[in-house]
Amino acid sequence: MSEESEKSFRPTILAPAGNKASFLAALAASADEIYCGLRQFSARMEARNFSIEELVPLTLLAHDKGVKVYVALNALLKPNDLNIAGELLQQLERRVKPDGIIIQDLGFVQLARQTGFSGELHFSTLSNVSFPAAIQKVKKSFGVHRVVLPRELNIDEIKAMATACPKGLGLEVFVHGALCYGVSGRCYWSSYFGGKSGLRGRCVQPCRRIYKQNEQKKRFFSCQDLSLDVLVKVLRTIPQIRTWKIEGRKKGPHTVFYTVKAYRILRDHGTDPKMKKEALHMLSYALGRSGTHYNFLPQRPQNPVRINNQTGSGLFVGAVKGTKQKPFLNPKEALLSGDLLRLGYEDELWHGTIRVGKYVPKGGRLFLKPILKKSPEKKIPVFLIDRQEKDLEDMVSKLEKELPKTPVFKSNASVFVARQPKTSGKKKGKILDLRVYRRIDKTKLHGTSGLWLSDQGVKKLPKRIWTRIWWWLPPVIWPDDEQKLKGLVDSVLSNGAKIFVLNAPWQTTLFTHLKEMNLWAGPFCNIANVLALKTLASLGYKGAIVIPELGQKDFLSLPKQSPLPLGIVLSGNWPLCISRALSNDLETETSFTSPKGESAWVKKFESDYWVFPNWKLDLSINRKALEKAGFRLFVHLLEPIPKKVKLKRRPGLWNWDLELL
C-alpha cells in the first residue's frame, strides 16, 4: 500500500474514559474518539461513569476539538428496563448528542428507532459477531455502522472479517487492555457464583481468583493484558479496520494518557525505530499488567494465561519484605510522590492501598505501615495503580477550565413508554420437554431430543431420525469454523432436518429458505426483554429460549408480552463460561476448587473450552409457575460427566430467588 493510500485509511484511536479526569486525559493525548458509560446500562458499572449532566460539557468540549464521543449502553436489558433505557436514550439525543451508542442487547435496536436516536449504532464485542457471514447480516438487518470484533481473533481471521465487510460498515479491533478469560457475551461465571452479571456490567472477576487443582493453587484463568504494540502495523494495511480500541474505563488518567500517546506514535510513526522504542517505553510506563499478543499471530500464538506471571491490575513493583511489624518495599521502579499502591490482589479481602509520600528511587526502601493484619506474612505483591504527575495534572486542569458552562435543562414532563410488540397468541400450545445431548444413541430416543451439531454427533446418528431432532448450533462460530459448520448445516438439511436452535441471532445467515425452517433462538442469544424478542421475530425466528440467569419476577413477566413462543432451560449443565484459551497447567475433565469451595471442570468441545460448575441448574421445582406464566418449551442440557468429576447435590436455582444485578 502506498504512503498516500495508508494515510487515507488511517484508523482512529478510541480511548476509554470512566471519569472526568480520564476523559480530559484522553483529549490531552489527542485521542480521535472517546467512549464512556452512563451510570446505568453500561458493561463497566465498576467504573465511576457519568451522569447526563456531567457528559454534556465534556461532549461539547470534545466536539469542539474534533473528537467523537460514543456512549456505551452495552448491558443486558431486563423486562422492566425498557422504559428507563428509552428515556435515557431520549435524554442523550436531546442534550448530549453523542456520535453513537455501543450496544449488545437487541432491545436497544428497537429503542433507538422508537426514540428517534440520530447517532450511529455500534455492536459491542458482547454481541458476539464472530464470523464473516454475520458481518453482512448485521449491516443488512440492523443498519449498524460499526462492529467491535472479538479479542480472540488472529490476524488471518480479522482479514476474513474485513473481506466480508460491506460498504458503510466499519470494524473496530482491540489493540490494548484487559483480556477476559471467557468469550465476550458467553461468560456467566460472576452471575452463577453470586448473582452479579457480567452482561450487566457487574462482573466480580471470578476468573482472577486462586483455584486449586490437585496440589496446585494458582490463578489458572487470570489473563495477561492484550498488547499488540508494534504488531499494529499489520492492521494499517486493512482499510475496513476503522478503529483501534484501547480498553480501560476503570483506569486512571495516567494510564489513558500514556496508552493513547503510545498508539498514536505506533500508528503515525510505526516505521521509525526510535519512535517505536519511545512508544514501547510509554506502554511500559502505563501501569498495566504484563502484555501478550495472544492469538494475533497464528503462526506464533501466545497463551494469555501464565500462572507464574503477576496478573493483578496495575504495574507490579515488588513484594513486601521485612516483618509484619516493620514491612518495607524495595521497588522495581522509581516511585513518585502521590503514587497510589495496592498491596495484595483485589479479590483478597485484606488488600489495601497506600499513597506514596515522597520520591523513592528504583531499588530504594519504602517503609510501610503495619496495616495488613490479616494478610499472609510473606510475598505480598505490590502494584502501582495510579500516578499523579504534575505535567499531566496541569494539562487536565487546563482542559477542565475550557469546559463550557451549560444552561440548566428544563425537563420535559412527558415520560417515555416503550411500544410493546403484539403477543404471539400461542401460550396455550403443546408443552414440550427437550433433552439436548452431545451424542444420541437408541436408548436416548424417547420424547423430543436435541443434539449439538458436530461431526462426531452426526456420524453415528441414523439419517431416518434427523427430521425429529432439534439441531443446536454452537454459542460461538469462529471465522475458521464457518465453512465447516455451514457444510454440516447443509448436510442435515438435505436429509430433512427442519428444526434448529441458533445460539447467536446472526446464525440465520447459514440458512437460505428461512420461511421453511423452524428456527429458535437459543439461550446463548441472551434474550431477556420483549423488544429483543420483537427483533428476533423480524429475523424469522419462530420461538426463543430466554437467558437462564434471570430472577423469578423477570422470568414470569416475559411470556405474557412476548411476540414469540418461549422456552427456558429448566435443568442441566450450564457453563460458567466458554473460552478459546486454556492454561498449560490446568487439566481438563478434572475438578478444580475456588476459595469458597465451589468446584468446576473444563471440557473441550470443537474449538472451545467449556467451564462447567459441578452442580446442575435446576428450576424443576418452579415448573408449574413457569407453565402458568406461558412457557411451553422446557430444555434439559445433558452433558457427559468426566470420570474424575463428581456432581454435588445443590438446589441449582441460580438467580431465581434473587434479583439479577
Positions of predicted regions on the chain:
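Long, basic N-terminal domains or extensions that often function
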Residues: 144-145
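Active-site pocket-lining/capping segments in soluble small-molecule metabolic enzymes
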Residues: 2-137, 148-243, 250-535, 539-661
